Curated annotation (Swiss-Prot):
EC code(s) of this entry: 4.2.1.19
One Pfam family hit: IGPD
First-tier enzyme category under EC: lyase
Gene3D superfamilies: Imidazole glycerol phosphate dehydratase, domain 1 (3.30.230.40)
Recorded GO MF terms: imidazoleglycerol-phosphate dehydratase activity
Pathway annotation: Amino-acid biosynthesis; L-histidine biosynthesis; L-histidine from 5-phospho-alpha-D-ribose 1-diphosphate: step 6/9
Record keywords, A-Z: Amino-acid biosynthesis, Cytoplasm, Histidine biosynthesis, Lyase
One GO BP: L-histidine biosynthetic process
Subcellular location: Cytoplasm
Reaction(s) catalysed by this chain's protein: D-erythro-1-(imidazol-4-yl)glycerol 3-phosphate = 3-(imidazol-4-yl)-2-oxopropyl phosphate + H2O
Protein name stated in the entry: Imidazoleglycerol-phosphate dehydratase
UniProt entry tagged with the keyword Cytoplasm: yes
């Protein structure tokens, strides 16, 4: 199988983002968004997925982290989709259930080409790492749309916002590792013969 690599960059009046991703990597990451908690989460995602990820962002953090995280998710999704290519010979679907101390999160992905987010967040506290909890919904929504994946995230239980979000990123990494696993087939994993 050819190297599954993608790169994407974007510059707006709010952010400047550059991403390089190798799906069949070793889980090495170099992340610098200017928002330390996001860097930590993205490092976890890369590690648990087994992706090599280089990502930089300069955003208007003096306003808040919204533009930064939204644009990071858009660019990450675009680079990931590029790396996947035609999605021939992959498992396509992956899931994971991950605890983090008192918190538990379930994540299921389908690399179907049809973007959708289901996000059950009832237990999330209103503020996580100094930002409103809705910031993470926007991140995952933007990622699902740009990567063209069906993404279900269920925060099952927990109290600590850091632990809950960390469990989600670890579970997403594991689910993506499983969904992108290559099994040697020359077929697209769909009865209709294409994923779009």
């Amino acid at each position: 199988m050819a190297k599954r690599f993608g790169a994407y960059s974007r510059e707006t009046g709010e952010t400047r983002v550059a991403v390089e991703i190798t799906i069949d990597g070793k889980g090495n990451a170099a992340i610098d968004t200017g928002f330390g908690f996001a860097d930590h989460m993205l490092n976890l995602l890369a590690f648990w997925a087994g992706f090599d990820l280089n990502l930089t962002c300069r955003g208007d953090l003096e306003v808040d982290a919204h533009h930064t995280l939204e644009d990071v998710a858009i660019c990450l999704g675009e680079a990931f989709r590029q790396a996947l290519g035609e999605r021939v010979g992959i498992e396509r679907v992956g899931d994971a259930r991950v605890p983090m101390d008192e918190a538990l999160c379930d994540v299921v992905v389908d690399l179907s080409g049809r973007p959708y987010l289901v996000y059950r967040e009832d237990v999330l506290p209103p503020v996580i790492a100094g930002e409103e909890k809705d910031l993470w919904r926007e991140f995952f929504k933007s990622l699902a749309i740009s990567a063209r994946m069906n993404l279900h995230i269920h925060f099952v239980y927990g109290q600590n916002g850091h632990h809950l979000v960390e469990a989600a990123f670890k579970a997403l990494g594991l689910a993506l590792r499983r969904a992108t696993a290559a099994h040697g087939s020359s077929r697209v994993p769909s009865t209709k013969g294409s994923l779009d």
